[in-house]
Amino acid sequence: MKYLKPINEFWGDVLKRDLLGETRKEDNIRSIEELRDYIISEIDRHGKNVVIKNLDISSIEDVCWLFSGRHDLESIDLSGWKTSNVTDMNNMFFDCRKIKSINLSGWDTSNVKNMGALFWNCRNLESLDLSGWDTSNVNTIREIFYNCEKLESLDLSGWDTSNVTDMRYAFSNCPAPYEVIDNKIVKK
């Protein structure tokens, strides 16, 4: 049997959310299952424009496929998430076809090794700022922006790809101002 919060705790969380104008989870998320359940509840609550700020997922290593196939999402703000132990972001936003805006500012990506197909087929994504992401431990960005056909504004300044061994199709069918030359990301 699943533990249910007493009603006063539940309404306390709702009141905190409404007063602050943003989603805040006071204690950290301890498992990917708990994170998935929480995200589904927030998507149900917010609809196509989701705001889940300052979430502590520091005990989770794998966020693969987390939002994949969410054709209903148009914008998502996940700024300020505590992601210091995440190592695998493979396919996190895979096939989010309608999404136009994603805010991932403030993420600690220093332990991430796999960013393969992270934004694969986010065909309506128009701009994305990933500057400041520590990519020094990443070894694959294969198909990271594959088929992001409207992504013209992309900021990857500060990216260190010296340990990346697989960059295949990273910018295929993507108008972003970057390309892969000699296994390095360069501005066009």
Feature-to-residue mapping (PLM):
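Negatively charged
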Residues: 2-188
